[in-house]
From Swiss-Prot:
The gene is menH. Pathway: Quinol/quinone metabolism; 1,4-dihydroxy-2-naphthoate biosynthesis; 1,4-dihydroxy-2-naphthoate from chorismate: step 3/7; Quinol/quinone metabolism; menaquinone biosynthesis. Monomer. The keyword Nucleotidyltransferase does not apply. The lineage of its organism: Bacteria, Pseudomonadati, Pseudomonadota, Gammaproteobacteria, Enterobacterales. It catalyses: 5-enolpyruvoyl-6-hydroxy-2-succinyl-cyclohex-3-ene-1-carboxylate = (1R,6R)-6-hydroxy-2-succinyl-cyclohexa-2,4-diene-1-carboxylate + pyruvate. Keywords: Lyase, Menaquinone biosynthesis. It comes from Escherichia coli O139:H28 (strain E24377A / ETEC). Belongs to the AB hydrolase superfamily. MenH family. Pfam families: Abhydrolase_6. This is 2-succinyl-6-hydroxy-2,4-cyclohexadiene-1-carboxylate synthase. One of its GO terms (molecular function) is 2-succinyl-6-hydroxy-2,4-cyclohexadiene-1-carboxylate synthase activity. Catalyzes a proton abstraction reaction that results in 2,5-elimination of pyruvate from 2-succinyl-5-enolpyruvyl-6-hydroxy-3-cyclohexene-1-carboxylate (SEPHCHC) and the formation of 2-succinyl-6-hydroxy-2,4-cyclohexadiene-1-carboxylate (SHCHC).
Length: 252
């Protein structure tokens, strides 16, 4: 079994760019940014429980890494960068720390490196279970209306929230809930030490208005790029700013 993905081919000899979306996104999420790099072959992946991979269920990050590894092999991707937002960034960091043959580097936008104590994990587990129950039982428009009121999305205006609620409500609530629980921050290890000892290139992007993740970025041994005029979802709020940072990283 492999993950559903859309592949776009570029010039031979350059590494692939493998894009991983955030929670409730899909393979289209990164395409406005990715298509600015037409010289590079691009793979836009649907994570388990999402988009064309909605029917794929996992028990945890190890399963996600295994599926990602098999997907890369199926497309004969031998050299690549992982580019991930939020959940996709956490998947990218986990997979990179577990080891992926051919990995050139990891570019993470607003991805959490992991909670640092049992109390934080227990609190997050309670929260994610409550959200998962709502995703399973309530209309998605109602759940996402509340989801985008969370502090991390404080930089969004009302129109942006309405647009995101409408877009994300096309998902399957049950499969979102399952993926939320399987890849909760409550079950993700703290990756700070692994990332400090890494053997791959590591870059971190965060919006200038995303105070939580700017603070987290300062804790990581990563080259950090702050995206102007953006909050947590920087590639959506300022795609040109993210394109500029990726171009600098890739020496485009």
């Amino acid at each position: 079994m492999i993950l559903h993905a859309q592949a776009k081919h570029g010039k031979p000899g350059l590494p692939w760019l493998v894009f991983l979306h955030g929670f409730s996104g899909d393979c289209h999420e990164w395409q406005e940014v990715g298509e600015a790099f037409a010289d590079y072959s691009r793979l836009y992946v649907d994570l388990p429980g999402h988009g064309g991979s909605a029917a794929i269920s996992v028990d945890g990050f190890d399963d996600v890494t295994d599926l990602l590894r098999k997907t890369l092999v199926s497309y004969n991707i031998l050299d690549f960068w992982l580019v991930g937002y939020s959940l996709g960034g956490r998947v990218a960091m986990m997979a990179a720390c577990q080891g992926l043959a051919g990995l050139c580097g990891v570019i993470v936008e607003g991805g959490h490196p992991g909670l640092q104590n049992a109390e934080q994990r227990a609190e997050r587990q309670r929260s994610d279970r409550q959200w998962a129950q709502r995703f399973r039982t309530e209309p998605l428009t109602a759940v996402f209306a509340d989801w985008y009121q969370q502090p991390v999305f404080a930089s969004l205006n009302d129109d942006q929230r309405r647009e995101l609620v409408a877009l994300r409500s096309n998902n399957n609530g049950a499969t979102l809930a399952a993926m939320l629980e399987a890849t909760s921050l409550a079950v993700q290890p703290d990756l700070r030490a692994n990332l400090s000892a890494r053997t791959f290139a590591f870059y971190y992007l965060c919006g200038e208005r995303d105070s939580k993740f700017r603070a987290l970025a300062a804790e990581l041994a990563a080259d950090c790029h702050v995206i102007p005029r953006a909050g947590h979802n920087a590639h959506r709020e300022n795609p040109a700013g993210v394109i500029a940072s990726l171009a600098q990283i890739l020496r485009f």
